[in-house]
Amino acid sequence: MNKFRNFPPINTLINDENLANYPLYLRAHFAKIIVSNCKKELSKDENLNFSLQDLLKKITQSIDEFLNAQSQSLINATGVIIHTNLGRSIIDESIFERTKEIICSYSNLEFNMQSGKRGSRYDALSANLKILFDCEDCLVVNNNASAVFLILNTLAKNEEVITSRSELVEIGGNFRIPEVMLAAGVRLKEIGTTNKTHLYDYEKAINENTKMILKTHRSNFAFKGFFEEVSLSEIHTLTKKKKIISYYDLGSGWCEKINKQLSKNEPSVKELLKHCDILSFSGDKLFGSTQAGIILGKKKYIQQLKKNQLLRMLRVDKITLAFLNETTKAYLEKEYEKIPTLKLLNDNLKTIEKKALFIKEKIPIKCELKASKSLVGGGSMPDKSLDTFVLSFDEKALLLQEKFRKKGVIGRVENGHFVLDFRSILEKDLNRLIHAIKEVFHA
C-alpha cells in the first residue's frame, strides 16, 4: 500500500514538460491507464519499482502507438497505384474543392427543387452516370460487395444462380462469392471445372428454377495454360434465349483513357454493358473515385433494386455522392488529369524519370536510377504491369524499409534492394520525400 503512495499524482504526469507536445486528452487518458496497470503489477510483485521517468516513458510509448494507428498522409512509393492498404484511389484537390460547397452546406440531397417536395438522393449522380455509360438506369451503394449482395437478393432470392467453378473467387477480407450467394438467399449451381467451362455446361444446367447466370471477373488473379471460358457475349445470348438474367460482377472496371499497356484484352464498362442485363463495379478502383458499388443495367432490374428494403442499409451518404458525381463530370468533360488514378496509370516514362532525377539530384545519398515495373493494384489486372523508374538504395533493404515507413514513406524491396517507385509518387509529395530521405540517412 505504501508503494502506491509513491506514485505521482495524475496531474503531475499530465503536466510534465516531456509530454507537453501531446494533446491533453491523450495525456490524461494514457496516464490513468499506465498508473493503473503499474499498480496492478506492483500488487503482484512488491519488488517492482516505477520511477517518474519509467511512467513517462510508458505513457509516451502508448501515445505514440496510438497516434501511429490514426489515419495519416503517406507517400506511396510502392509503384502499386490502386494500393488497397494505402486507401486505393485518391481524390484530386480540384475535385475536393468542387465538393466542399455541397459537403459544408445544406444541400438538395433529397429535395426536389422544382416541386419543393422530397426528392431522391440518387437523381443527380444517376443522370450523369447514365450519360457517361449510355445505360438505361443505375444505382450506387456503399461498395461492390454490397452491390453483389443486393443484386442477388433482389433478383434471384430462393432461385438458382449458375456460375462457373473457375469464378468462385475470394477477394480481400475473406469475401467469397459462394458464401455471399448463400447469405443473399440464392441457390448456387456450380458448373464446369476449375480450368475449363464450356457453353454447353451452362445450357445443360438451366432448368425451370434458374433465375440468373452470374459471371465474375477474376480481377485479382489470372489463369494461364490449359484454360477455357465462355465469353460474356455468349452467355448473354443464351440468357436472352432462355429468358433469364445475365449479371456481370466486374469488380474493377475502367471507363476511358487507359494506358495501352493495360487496355489490350481488357474490355471497358461501356463495351461490357452491351452483353449483360446488369453489372457492378467498384468506385474506388479503376474508376478512380471514392468507395462505392456502381450498378448499371436494364431499368426494370434497377427499379427492383431500389424497392428492396436492404437499400436503406446499403445506401451512400452525401459525401460519397458528391465525390462520385464530380468524378463522373470530370469524365464527361474529359478532364482526365483531375482523376489521379488515370493520371498515374497514363504517365509516360519521361514524366516518371523526371520525378526520379529531381529527387536524385537533391539528395547527397548514393542511389541508382533503374528501370522497373509497376502494378495497377486494387485487385485489378493481375497479369499486367507498367514500365517505371525507381531509385534503388544499397543499404540493408528491410532495415531501410522500416526507417522510411517511420517517416511516412512506403516503398518496396526488389532484388534485395529497397526502392522508391516514382510511378505512384505524386508531384506534390516530392519535396516532402526529399526531407524524409535526408532524415532517414541523417544527411
From Swiss-Prot:
Report keywords, A-Z.
Cytoplasm, Protein biosynthesis, Pyridoxal phosphate, Selenium, Transferase
Cell compartments where the protein resides? Cytoplasm
What are its cofactors?
A: pyridoxal 5'-phosphate
Biological processes annotated in GO = conversion of seryl-tRNAsec to selenocys-tRNAsec; selenocysteine incorporation
EC number from the UniProt entry: 2.9.1.1
Q: Which residues carry this modification: N6-(pyridoxal phosphate)lysine?
A: K285
Q: Which reaction does it catalyse?
A: L-seryl-tRNA(Sec) + selenophosphate + H(+) = L-selenocysteinyl-tRNA(Sec) + phosphate
Q: What is its main location?
A: cytoplasm
Q: What is this protein called?
A: L-seryl-tRNA(Sec) selenium transferase
